[in-house]
Regions:
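Hydrophobic transmembrane alpha-helices and their immediate loop junctions
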Residues: 1-233
Length: 233
């Protein structure tokens, strides 16, 4: 809200130097922008989420969801610096209170823990995180639901559970059809389970090519680690 207000106000002032008519159009948006600014200045929680002030208040008080958000930001910051998930201090994954399933940070925290565990090779705890995510499917946005289903294909493939891998795959066909390293890695694991070595190698190569487009060095390192394990299988 605050950023929107400042942008509209600045544009209105600048256009006034050149055109009164154009400036009038932008000045018309200032009251609504000011309303958003004031709305976000109050620590309220609405159906669409928390206002900026409510989030800030939670951070100051180290409330569960806000603490999880700050820790997630720290994790992604370190991923950008080149650390992989398992190389980041585990306190950012686990030094958190229990969150309710309908809290968005609940799913994000479990997703980060899953990646931490799977990179370390702790497949039991990784599977537990995925299963808990699947159990909270009703609260997940579609994109995250698809990603969870795709990672379930990966886990079931590693466990040689063809039936469950195929069931999970039916829930995320479009996601697995994407030209991403994650999708190719999951399909490669599925082919490895079926003994389709040549298809697995081809998909691994495609995944490695996709990684050239990955901007986050830590995620690139993570995917390379998982791909290397497929070669060992």
């Amino acid at each position: 809200g605050g950023v929107y207000f400042l942008i509209v106000l600045l544009v209105a002032l600048l256009t006034g130097l050149f055109s009164k008519n154009a400036s009038f159009l932008f000045w018309g948006g200032v009251p609504y922008a000011a309303y958003l600014l004031l709305l976000n200045a109050l620590p309220f929680v609405y159906g669409e989420g928390k206002t900026d002030a409510a989030v800030l208040k939670g951070i100051v008080k180290e409330a569960g969801a806000e603490k999880a958000m700050v820790y997630a930001m720290e994790i992604y910051g370190e991923l950008s610096e080149g650390k992989s998930f398992s190389e980041i201090d585990e306190k950012y994954y686990f030094d958190l209170p229990q969150l309710p399933e309908d809290e968005p940070m609940y799913a994000m925290t479990l997703d980060l823990r899953y990646r931490y565990y799977v990179e370390k090779g702790d497949m039991k705890n990784a599977a537990d995180c995925l299963n808990r995510l699947a159990a909270s499917a009703q609260y997940l946005p579609q994109a995250q639901f698809d990603e969870v289903a795709a990672e379930l294909v990966y886990m079931h493939s590693l466990n040689k559970d063809t039936e469950r891998a195929e069931e999970s795959g039916k829930l995320c066909k479009e996601y697995l059809g994407k030209d991403t390293a994650q999708a190719k890695r999951i399909l490669a694991a599925y082919c490895a389970m079926l003994g389709k070595t040549e298809e697995m190698k081809a998909l691994k190569t495609q995944a490695e090519n996709c990684l050239s487009r990955e901007d986050t060095e830590g995620i690139k390192k993570f995917e390379k680690i998982l791909l290397s394990r497929l070669c060992e299988a």
